[in-house]
């Protein structure tokens, strides 16, 4: 098989990074749930599907200060902190505008006790990595997370090609004697019939 594990991991990481960057530009959408506002919070948290390859954890906010928040990782005996300086993407001025005690959020470990806030993207994507010389598929990723969506955007999506089709048209023109600087008449054409 031409698939390469290193390429596959690099493609998955690149796709996730791009999707997360785009999603962050859309801003923060709110915590998953608040334990003080929803009596059924434990069942809702237990039903959350999270891809283990993301290396995320589910955390509860235990203390909110202006520029520092303390968290407790659920189902583990771990506590940590989130620093506000890493959350400029949220569009908020401080933690008091962002989170409250009892909020349940996704986090990812940065260092020993420092964590960063995460959110599941609303957008998705796919990526196909091919060797341009022989056409072999080197890596194929069908989405951000198989757990959150089993639809494979790389093989199952029926997308219009858009500008991706231009090289095929240009190649056909070059094969038929056109040059890159050839002038093409772009005026309406009328043909009289009889």
Q: Over which residues does each language-model region extend?
A:
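Extended, non-catalytic substrate-recognition/exosite surfaces adjacent to catalytic cores, especially
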Residues: 1-194
């Amino acid at each position: 098989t031409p698939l390469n594990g290193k390429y596959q991991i690099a493609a998955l990481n690149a796709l996730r990074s791009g999707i997360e960057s785009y999603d962050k530009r859309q801003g923060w959408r709110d915590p998953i749930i608040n334990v003080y506002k929803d009596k059924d919070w434990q069942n809702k948290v237990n039903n959350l599907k999270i891809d283990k390859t993301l290396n995320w954890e589910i955390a509860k906010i235990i203390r909110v200060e202006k520029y520092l928040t303390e968290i407790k990782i659920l189902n583990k005996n771990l506590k940590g902190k989130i620093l506000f300086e890493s959350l400029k993407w949220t569009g908020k001025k401080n933690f008091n505008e962002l989170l409250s005690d009892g909020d349940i959020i996704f986090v990812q470990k940065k260092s020993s006790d420092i964590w960063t806030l995460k959110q599941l993207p609303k957008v998705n994507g796919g990526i196909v990595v091919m060797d341009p010389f022989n056409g072999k598929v080197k890596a194929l990723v069908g989405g951000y997370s198989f757990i959150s969506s089993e639809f494979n955007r790389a093989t199952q999506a029926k997308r219009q090609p858009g500008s991706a089709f231009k090289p095929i048209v240009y190649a056909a023109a070059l094969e038929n004697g056109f040059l890159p600087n050839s002038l093409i008449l772009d005026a309406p054409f009328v043909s009289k019939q009889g």
